Design a protein with these regions (language model features):
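Axial heme c-ligation environment in periplasmic c-type cytochrome domains
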Residues: 47-54, 66-100
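Generic N-terminal leader/processing signal
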Residues: 1-2, 28, 54
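ATP/adenylate-binding site constellation spanning eukaryotic-like Ser/Thr protein kinases
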Residues: 58
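N-terminal export/targeting leaders of redox proteins
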Residues: 1-23, 100
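The canonical Cys-X-X-Cys-His
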Residues: 34-42, 92
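Regular, well-ordered alpha-helical segments
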Residues: 38-41, 63-66, 70
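Electrostatic cytochrome c docking/interface patches
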Residues: 14-33, 47, 62, 67
Length: 100
């Protein structure tokens, strides 16, 4: 019984560690945001007709970026997101979510 409990704890700790690593890094996102700034502003404030990104929930930004990367809706955004890794997306989302 103790071995089963130990195994469960070890597996759970790996799962939690994987989630922690997937979290975005705002500083790394800022470094990647130069391409975004041309349409969304240097602080994510938005430049009409493009939406503001600053302060949006990171989960919403991650979903939108992944949808664009998969080709949903915008061919322009698809082209801009095609080369982003999942970690790049997490980082960009963390950066824009951190802005007010």
């Amino acid at each position: 019984m103790a071995r089963k409990l130990t195994a469960i704890i070890i597996v759970a700790s790996f799962a939690v560690a994987g989630v922690a690593q997937a979290a975005g890094n705002a500083a790394a996102g800022k470094d990647k945001s130069a391409v975004c700034a041309g349409c969304h502003g240097d602080r994510g404030q938005g430049i009409a007709p493009n939406p503001a990104l600053a302060g949006k929930p990171d989960a919403d930004l991650v979903k939108a970026l992944k949808d664009f990367k998969s080709g949903r809706v915008s061919s322009v955004m698809h082209g801009l997101t095609a080369s982003l890794s999942d970690q790049d997306i997490e980082n960009l989302a963390a950066y824009y979510a951190s802005l007010k």
